[in-house]
Amino acid sequence: MREINVSQITDVIEKLCIEANEHLPEDVKCAIKTCRACEDGEIAKGILDNIIENFDIADNENVPICQDTGMACVFLEIGQDVHFVGGDLTDAINEGVRRGYDKGYLRKSVVKDPVRRGNTGDNTPAMIYTEIVPGDKVKITVGPKGFGSENMSQIRMFKPSAGLQGIKDFILEVVETAGPNPCPPMVVGVGIGGTFDKCALLAKKALMRPLDSQNPDPFYADLEKEMLEKVNKLGIGPQGFGGKTTAIGLNIETMPTHIAGMPCAVNINCHVTRHKSEVI
């Protein structure tokens, strides 16, 4: 049994909130630059040049990449041999978010109630997702999620008779409906299987995966490639002005499901696909 003081969790989350908002992952930057080299249209190339300039400035000056610094989504992979001491884990996570958004001068975007609103003033509470894994370590991932793209996301509870074609059509429908709203080029996270809630979580976890990775199952790896090509053929293009680059990545995550269902969720992210991780 390994003891970890929750103050360590707070410190790491504070740091990750700031870093994730100021520095895009290298795989995302590389994907954007690769797409820039493939674009033909002057408008599309100009927009991608602006995007590249923007994340370069954010890197060099340590400022947020986007004014929407997101709702803090915190993923914890907790080793089963870990015992947290020194306080409540949830409180420690929220304190890390509170400090990070204050210290980093990040916009506070969370309201107390979904209907009656009222800003909490510190970007808490975080959306917390935990998974118990073997070992005595804790992996923390912070993925700030903006809502221009989150609002474009959808889930559909298919019957198995919809088949693979139903899933393909749904992915394209969601992206086409989103159009310019999620600040393309976008990243598309797809979850297939599980229950209503688990399917949506799979789609969000797909957004945390590096864009230069692929699903370990060759069937779904091929589907990722096929659907990314089809999404880009929609021609929405950078910021919706047309072009070859509607999406810079499409990741699929799956899990077993009930014999009577085939849930599919599509979680859209903008080109500012932010996530940072650290292991304690």
Q: For each predicted feature, which ranges?
A:
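Non-transmembrane, aqueous-exposed alpha-helical and coiled segments at domain scale
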Residues: M1-I280
